[in-house]
């Protein structure tokens, strides 16, 4: 996620945050490779709160575990930051409305980074449809299947305090269909 921002001209990455300080520190290598200065590191359960209080941050990009997307976004908006959130942006309808209302109240942008709407395949298909390659499109259907078998070891929870094993539980609870926007968004 950090490497994406290093390719945007004029972007400065002044702070990084992860529950695990080693993971945040590892991102310094990405900045170094892009000839960017080191960023301040924040970590722990509430490290994002300190990051959001900084005056030199315009945008907080959130790529945390899903349960933390909303509280981090809320904190960032309340501290006058624009917010970009990987999907899902919230875990229930109330949190969605809270983000909408906070964004409107603070006059700060809050947007979902739905990569399955703007990735190469989706944009190529849109271009083909707009150029008549398929004729008149009268119906479309979307689906999303994500084979995560290569990542099961990473997603498996190794004890009660393991912060990285969160995703497998969501996949089991929701029949593996955890990204409704991935299949529906491009349609």
Predicted regions and their residues:
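Acidic-histidine catalytic/liganding microenvironments
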Residues: 5-8, 54, 119, 131
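Predominantly a Rossmann-like dinucleotide-binding segment in NAD(P)-dependent oxidoreductases
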Residues: 106-111, 116-187
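A short helix-to-beta-strand connector/capping loop
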Residues: 33-41, 105-109
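A structured beta-alpha segment of the ubiquitous adenosine-cofactor-binding alpha/beta core
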Residues: 39-59
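Conserved hydrophobic residues forming the short capping helix/wall of the S-adenosyl-L-methionine
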Residues: 28-32, 103, 129
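Beta-strand-loop-alpha-helix segment that lines the small-molecule cofactor/substrate pocket
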Residues: 59, 65-66, 70-118, 132
